[in-house]
């Protein structure tokens, strides 16, 4: 792929003043996926600012693996910092190495095994509330389950149901509002409109709540096997540690990333399985064979190989984030185009992960393309659902573990059928996108049914 002769182009349809921002707000996924028809590196306009979109997997690899030059910045990260501050996902290059070293121990496999116990407890509690014949609205239900699961993993001390519901509502309001905030001019974001006030008030509540939890943990030196305790205890090789503000930002980051990623991926998986009953039947068979009617545990995960490939393929076709941005920290050449310092790069893993040069029949749902004897280096390189290079998501295994436990738990107890009123046109949120409407009917089952 590195021998490819790249073509640079310009996207048509820019409107005076707003550029292509109106298209990104109306049909963001369609707009981003349409750009490859105009070149491998495509120039767009967001308001008065020009930006460049790498549409070819090799160009995106160059951007993601050179984080010194292609630094975190641009419209997405400017607004994401409202929520996550200077956390690991949003921090610039100068802060990233130190933060990554300090957080690494909290995401080691030994820690993940401990977290999996908390994950299972919340997933089991959610499944226990369902009844034979229950119909659930997939994304909201799975979003709530994922948020409660991440919260229990972070913070093992019980909280009131009222606080848990308030946090869930606040996150939903903020993450939905962030999409709108990304494309509003600064002057409009400052206006005291009902939407802006809801966004600010809920954002303030989230920050205050997280700070209260950190303060409580600082006062109480009880040993806990949760993620917040691991962050508080982490040290680098020089004995340095994360400060309270840094821990605050990391907690918000983990909650936001871990919730939307898992909920969106699981929702798309149920849609895909409904369209491919032969793969669905194989999945039920694997879960029944491996678990034999028992709840899934950490030690079962390596044996759930088809489950893992289904998650990977869903992440390829519907990656958890539809848009990211970077900002060039110095002048650089990309696809033969000279980009001056301060140039905005915009990219969508969704469009790149369906590129024909990386995947045969890229629009087809084929989990077995990830079998060791079928996958290629090019395909692995083009898979950027969790990023790549030094800034690859530190929580990729965390999210995969949560998704695998949730999927195996649900399908070991329930036969899941998509209701006929499904509308799978994608709805974009701040980072993820999900079907407009996907309701699931749950029918109780036992292994072999």
Swiss-Prot record:
Its EC number is 1.14.15.32. It is found in: Membrane. CDD domains: CYP170A1-like. GO terms for biological process: antibiotic biosynthetic process. Pathway: Antibiotic biosynthesis; neopentalenolactone biosynthesis. It holds the Pfam family p450. It is an enzyme of class 1 (oxidoreductase). Belongs to the cytochrome P450 family. This is Pentalenene oxygenase. It comes from Streptomyces avermitilis (strain ATCC 31267 / DSM 46492 / JCM 5070 / NBRC 14893 / NCIMB 12804 / NRRL 8165 / MA-4680). The gene is ptlI.
């Amino acid at each position: 792929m590195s021998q490819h002769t790249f073509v640079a182009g310009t996207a048509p349809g820019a409107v005076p003043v707003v550029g292509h921002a109106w298209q990104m707000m109306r049909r963001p996924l369609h707009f981003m996926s349409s750009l490859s028809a105009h070149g491998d590196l495509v120039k767009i306009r967001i308001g008065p600012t020009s930006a460049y979109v790498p549409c070819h997997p090799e160009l995106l690899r160059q951007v993601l693996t050179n984080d010194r030059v292609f630094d975190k910045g641009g419209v997405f990260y400017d607004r994401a910092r409202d929520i996550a501050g200077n956390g690991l996902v949003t921090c610039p290059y100068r802060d990233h190495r130190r933060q990554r070293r300090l957080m690494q121990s909290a995401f080691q496999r030994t820690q993940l095994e401990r977290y999996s116990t908390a994950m299972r407890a919340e997933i089991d509690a959610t499944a226990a509330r369902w009844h034979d014949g229950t119909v659930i609205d997939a994304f909201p239900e799975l979003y709530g389950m994922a948020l409660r699961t991440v919260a229990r993993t972070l913070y093992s001390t019980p909280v009131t149901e009222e606080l848990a519901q308030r946090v869930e509502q606040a996150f939903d309001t903020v993450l939905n509002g962030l999409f709108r905030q990304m494309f509003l001019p600064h002057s409009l974001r400052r206006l005291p409109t009902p939407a802006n006030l809801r966004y600010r008030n809920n954002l303030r509540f989230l920050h205050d709540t997280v700070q209260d939890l950190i303060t409580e943990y600082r006062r109480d030196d009880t040993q806990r096997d949760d993620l917040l305790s691991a962050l508080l205890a982490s040290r680098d090789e020089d004995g340095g540690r994360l400060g309270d503000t840094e821990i605050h930002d990391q907690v918000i980051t983990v909650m936001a990333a871990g919730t939307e990623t898992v909920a969106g991926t699981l929702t798309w998986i149920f849609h895909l399985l409904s369209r491919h009953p032969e793969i669905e039947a194989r999945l039920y068979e694997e879960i029944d064979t491996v678990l034999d009617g028992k709840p899934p545990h950490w030690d079962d995960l390596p044996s759930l190989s088809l489950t893992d490939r289904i998650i990977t393929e869903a992440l390829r076709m519907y990656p958890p984030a539809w848009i990211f941005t970077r900002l060039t920290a110095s002048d650089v050449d990309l696809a033969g185009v000279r980009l001056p310092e301060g140039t905005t790069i915009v990219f969508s893993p969704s469009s790149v992960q369906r590129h024909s040069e990386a995947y045969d029949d890229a629009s087809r749902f084929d989990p077995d393309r990830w079998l060791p004897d079928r996958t290629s280096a090019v395909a692995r390189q083009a898979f950027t659902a969790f990023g790549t290079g030094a800034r690859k998501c530190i929580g990729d295994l965390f999210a995969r573990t949560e998704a695998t436990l949730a999927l195996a738990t649900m399908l070991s107890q329930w036969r899941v059928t998509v209701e006929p009123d499904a509308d799978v046109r994608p709805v974009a949120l701040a980072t993820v996108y999900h079907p407009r409407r996907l309701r699931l009917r749950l029918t109780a089952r036992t292994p072999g049914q």
